């Protein structure tokens, strides 16, 4: 089963990562989202990583176009962090960047009131120490469903895929928690992840039409299809 690799702190109890869930919200709903450490198995070795609501990627949050929802975010890590909703048009005070609010200290909570005026796929991630927090698994998707049924061509299924790469050397994910290192400037990983898995599999039937939503959460790597 491998051993627990210490990438960050000496936390004694870390829960295993869970499968990513899909959460459907409607206008006016609230949802609780927590960032915390998890134990993640990669090719038989357990690593201490970071996650939203215990999964890598975090929950797929599905909302109708035009909806306004509240994300009650808790910082369950031992570092400062923020929740940035990438590409979503919103009030600046809920942008989740250092220019819009103070960094959230460990244990603090903040309610992000988000509006989703545009259909499509977006993603959320930290805007503090992305070289560390995002690299260890803090990312997830929003799927904004178009109000116009003809906005997209009809398909049999929709599948979001988050692509990532992790750099593992000598059995460890070596990241500097104390300060940002060269990782911030870009690096290639040597282990590919699709929806958090090294061996992601998908079954399809002949004639089935599938719409894929692709998010590149890798540090610097381009992906060719």
Residue ranges and their predicted role:
Residues 2-225:
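Histidine-centered copper-binding motifs that mark active-site loops
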């Amino acid at each position: 089963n491998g051993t627990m690799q210490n990438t960050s702190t000496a936390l004694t109890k870390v829960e295993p990562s869970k499968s990513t869930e899909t959460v459907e919200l409607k206008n006016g709903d609230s949802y609780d989202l927590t960032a915390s450490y998890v134990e993640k198995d990669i090719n038989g070795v357990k690593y201490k990583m970071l996650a939203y609501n215990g999964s890598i990627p975090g929950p797929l949050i599905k909302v109708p176009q035009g909806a306004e929802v509240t994300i009650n975010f808790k910082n369950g890590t031992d570092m400062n962090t923020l929740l940035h909703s990438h590409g979503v048009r919103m009030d600046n005070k809920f942008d989740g960047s250092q220019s819009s609010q103070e960094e959230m200290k460990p244990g603090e909570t903040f309610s992000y009131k988000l509006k989703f005026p545009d259909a499509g796929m977006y993603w959320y991630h930290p805007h503090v120490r992305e070289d560390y927090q995002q690299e260890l698994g803090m990312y997830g998707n929003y799927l904004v469903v178009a109000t116009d049924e003809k906005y997209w061509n009809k398909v049999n299924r929709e599948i979001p895929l988050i692509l990532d790469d992790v750099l593992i050397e000598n059995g460890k994910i070596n990241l500097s928690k104390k300060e940002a290192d060269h990782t911030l400037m870009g690096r290639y990983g040597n282990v590919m992840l699709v929806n958090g898995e090294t061996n992601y599999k998908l079954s399809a039937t002949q004639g089935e039409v599938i719409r894929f939503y692709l998010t590149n959460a890798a540090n610097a790597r381009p992906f060719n299809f």
